[in-house]
């Protein structure tokens, strides 16, 4: 079965078109061209701005021209993650989709349902002749996954509507009314390389096939962080053997993805092969036991002997680096006392990459619904890395979205959901970033909610969309549009 055989047919057909367009974050020229071409083919007016956002304008259903204009919003980009054994060029290759029971997934890569299904449903609304709706402005932003370039650079003159439906949530049955703010902290560790000496045996230490996932939506699940697990082992090895040498460390990827894989090239004093391999065996058993409930038994940790490298990080730089990575705050840092069950503050040790012969770059990603708490955890990490001589920079923080429980839009959405499905939706704030807070700053008075179909394991190659939820999400979206048009 192909995804174009699924219902609602228009949504899946539009999503199928989107999967054929390479669209990793920061590489969206093809997606912009696709959206413009799609609008032209369907006779829709459109506008773009300097950063690459696209807005399509769809007339109201006849008779509803005076209804309030509704903004349907999704983001163009997708997280580009793949399994290590998969050959895939995100800049040129289409996503290969697979229907598997009640789920749609990709072949070894992220699916891009985040936020391709949101974009596809906005497109489907504009070409479905059977729907009732007022004027529609469909806003497709760029670079939501990293940098929020689209939301921050949006020309608000392109948008006249003051009711916005953000289609970028991942749990059907939940209406989101607020989100956390976030920022990245990037530490550059200056170091020197020297010739690798004799007298050491060299090993590649590798951890892979962790679940990873979204560093906001899934940070509370206790999943392993590949960078920290690797640094922990290196720290233990240094403690056991007195000294270790380090030639390379590569781990993680995007700031908002929990790292699934990391590897290092490490030297230990010669003659300790048996002890080192036994230590690795014990460590593997330990972390498998620790992570059994969060990860299952599918991830791997192993060591394999390698040839002596020509160059390595000078010895005096190794201990400060390994100790600091190991000691970096990671995971949930505080729970909300105002909203039971909501993560208030977190940090993700997102990536560690030795670059060239003179530096290691460590990227962490902080989130909090309390600005001062986000600043506090950022300051702690900054102090930690500056203490070993790093140059630390932070990006501009993304704006959180304060909940408005008195929203008229929220009340209408709750009524629609209850009438359709017979139970009340969950109404929550998220420990994840959405563009809504920025929209509210740029377009004061905007009434907003966020919702979407059920997606699992986003930002990882295990990402999948629950097919039955897409149909129910579509019913909810179209019913809500009709109710808003008739108010």
PLM feature spans:
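Active-site metal-coordination/substrate-binding segment of hydrolases
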Residues: 64-146, 151-162, 335-336, 341-344, ...
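Midchain, well-structured core segments that form catalytic/ion-binding scaffolds
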Residues: 102-105, 145-146, 151-367
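Active-site-adjacent substrate-binding region
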Residues: 218, 225-249, 391, 395, ...
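Acidic/His- and Gly-rich active-site-bordering loop/insert found
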Residues: 2-103
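Zn-dependent metallopeptidase/amidohydrolase metal-coordination segment
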Residues: 7, 11, 337, 344-358, ...
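Acidic, glycine-rich active-site loops and adjacent beta-strand->loop/helix elements
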Residues: 76-78, 110, 139-147, 168-172, ...
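His/Asp/Glu-rich mid-to-C-terminal helical/loop segments that flank catalytic regions of hydrolases
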Residues: 223-240, 269-273, 319-326, 333-337, ...
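Substrate-recognition/cap regions that form aromatic- and gly/pro-loop-enriched pockets
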Residues: 342-432
